[in-house]
């Protein structure tokens, strides 16, 4: 990369996760690449925003209000950044690894060369495939008029756990479109039942991530390499800068997080197997 852009870092979690936000702030400093580091909590949000979402933005709610704050805090900072500056958003549960600085700069170079100025990773779990149609409600596919596009429905979902953005007109348009969904059609975000049919193997909606993922594919953006943030095997992660640990700062976090991930994966696998068996039975009955 001939010229290193100005680099920004941002993360957010409510104040119950102060241990996680303190940790990721220090890790961002230890990376020694960011010109500005912004680690926020609910006190960082504007009064008008809090008033708008006060009914859902409560402690214990999913994503502290279905992650309504995520596109908002990213967009708010991007609007203040100079053109062509690069922002890395990470969930506060991530860990940053200074040994992976070289690979981090590869990601920066990738978003610098992107015509859209947005880069993210596929969602990656070794236990099961995170295929879009299983993790996005039917209404979202119909809203974006892509229900019949197998390149979207049958491909892996794009994660919003880590996002690289370069400030340019196309990335700002992307962010505003993503953010506006909360205001224009909140039922696409939440856990309310889909009005239109879900796919037969649907498991659950992934809220902000479902919207982001569909948009990412419609914008025809190439994802970053899959599996470079997964921490199933720490021994192979030294060269990678961002670890998807889900370390929320609670006591015995690493062990508890692993147990929770295992239990959730098992529940999801059982749900997927049930749907597959149901589909086979229905096909058999139709043939008879």
Question: Where on the chain are the PLM-derived regions?
Answer:
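Glycosyltransferase catalytic domains, chiefly GT-A lineage
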Residues: 1-288
């Amino acid at each position: 990369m001939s010229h290193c852009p100005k680099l920004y870092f941002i993360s957010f979690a409510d104040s119950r996760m102060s241990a996680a936000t303190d940790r990721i702030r220090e890790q961002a400093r230890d990376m020694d690449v960011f010109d500005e580091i912004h680690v926020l909590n609910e006190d960082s949000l504007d009064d008008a925003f809090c008033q708008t979402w006060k009914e859902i933005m409560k402690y214990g709610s999913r994503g502290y209000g279905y992650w309504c704050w995520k596109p908002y805090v990213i967009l708010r900072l991007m609007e203040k950044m100079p053109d062509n500056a690069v922002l890395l958003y990470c969930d506060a549960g991530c860990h940053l690894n200074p040994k992976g600085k070289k690979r981090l700069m590869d990601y920066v170079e990738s978003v610098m060369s992107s015509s859209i100025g947005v880069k993210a990773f596929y969602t990656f779990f070794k236990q099961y495939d995170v295929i879009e149609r299983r993790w996005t409600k039917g209404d979202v596919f119909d809203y974006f008029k892509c229900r019949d596009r197998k390149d979207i429905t049958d491909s892996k979902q794009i994660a919003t756990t880590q996002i690289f953005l370069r400030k340019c007109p196309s990335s700002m348009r992307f962010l505003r479109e993503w953010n506006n969904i909360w205001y224009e059609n909140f039922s696409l975000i939440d856990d309310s039942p889909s009005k239109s049919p879900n796919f037969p193997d649907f498991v659950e909606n992934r809220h902000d991530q479902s919207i982001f993922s569909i948009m990412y594919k419609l914008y025809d953006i190439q994802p970053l390499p899959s599996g470079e943030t997964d921490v199933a095997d720490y021994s192979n992660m030294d060269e990678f800068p961002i670890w998807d640990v889900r370390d929320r700062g609670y006591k015995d976090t690493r062990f508890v997080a692993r147990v929770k991930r295992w239990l959730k994966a098992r529940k999801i696998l059982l749900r997927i197997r049930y749907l597959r068996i149901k589909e086979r039975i229905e096909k058999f009955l139709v043939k008879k």
